[in-house]
Amino acid sequence: GADVFLLRRVQALTEGFSTPMAGDTPAFVALLHGTLDQVRGGTPRTDVERINYNENINSRLIVRSFGGNDYFAVDDNAALTTLDTGAGDDEVQIGQMYGAPRVSVPAPGTVAAGDDFATIETTAGFLSRGATFSLTAYGGTGNDQFTVYSNKAEIRLEGNDGNDVFVVRAFALKNQPGLSTEETTQAIGGE
């Protein structure tokens, strides 16, 4: 079926630890159950599969979705990353726009305790970093869409088979010079 994946670098890992683990660039990959509309609409299911990791992961983080019309949202990463979307009409979103900073305090926050993450204030809202470590995304078969709002490291997007769409947007930063997509983005359409 259709899967919804969330990749995010966070302030600290708290679940399962007596003391929050904040060193070594903590991050997680989560498989959010339910539909993309449920997740976006603020009514996601509570059964989430989450894997915590940090920059000391051996080699590379690889996330495979296999079949289905899957969605990958990347707010940030903490290691070299490969996304393999497999078969289906998939979407990969690198960097997301929010209406407020993603902080846990003051209560009630916009994220769970420890899951705070950096955003950049733009003229359109608060933008997540996208990718701090190099990222490669493979579209596999199907008509895939790749959208980049922000990247702080080189990213490579490979459409593979099907009619794929590549969108790279730049946002003006608020109160500072520069744009949100200043790093290298390679888009390869495939066959």
Label each PLM-derived region with a short phrase:
Residues 1-191:
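Acidic, glycine-rich low-complexity segments
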